[in-house]
Amino acid sequence: MNIRQQITQFLSLAYVFSSAFMLWKTLSVIANSHSPIVVVLSGSMEPAFQRGDILFLWNRDQQQKVGDIVVYEIDGKTIPIVHRVLREHHNQQKQLLLTKGDNNAVDDLSLYAKKQQYLNQKADLVGTVKGYLPFIGYVTILISENVYFKYGMLGLLGLSSLFSNE
């Protein structure tokens, strides 16, 4: 393989990654959310959503109501949580929410930060669920939880780049 083919392959790969990044950033701006697409990682929302479902979020100046399914993040925790709004209150121009997983026995108070009794709609919410695709996100769960699957996928990608003729 000559240098021109190597440069072409590198540029093609860079094009794929930059296109994916631009698509992600465009979705982020449109949905007004730093993470417009999330994968359900647990069974706390069954039967509404199963583990591995991909959720599409929207966060454009809307008030949540009881029954809405929201995704939120807590300070100090890296994994977003998908749960349903159980109660909502208004306090000094801000909306406060209490959430609970459909498959959980109790509300999410124990998941919130210390001394936090409600979620702040503006500060804690990533978005409201507007749509989903079932089970497609299971690949990301397999990659994060199974080391052999992760290295197998990396190996296949490496082999495919070595043996491609273009």
Curated annotation (Swiss-Prot):
Organism (species): Candida dubliniensis (strain CD36 / ATCC MYA-646 / CBS 7987 / NCPF 3949 / NRRL Y-17841)
GO biological process, one term: signal peptide processing
Domain of life: Eukaryota
Topological domains, Lumenal: 31-166
A Pfam family recorded for this sequence: Peptidase_S24
Subunit composition and interactions: Component of the signal peptidase complex (SPC) composed of a catalytic subunit SEC11 and three accessory subunits SPC1, SPC2 and SPC3. The complex induces a local thinning of the ER membrane which is used to measure the length of the signal peptide (SP) h-region of protein substrates. This ensures the selectivity of the complex towards h-regions shorter than 18-20 amino acids. SPC associates with the translocon complex.
PROSITE patterns: SPASE_I_1 (PS00501), SPASE_I_3 (PS00761)
Family listed: Belongs to the peptidase S26B family.
Name of the featured protein: Signal peptidase complex catalytic subunit SEC11
Molecular function GO labels: serine-type endopeptidase activity
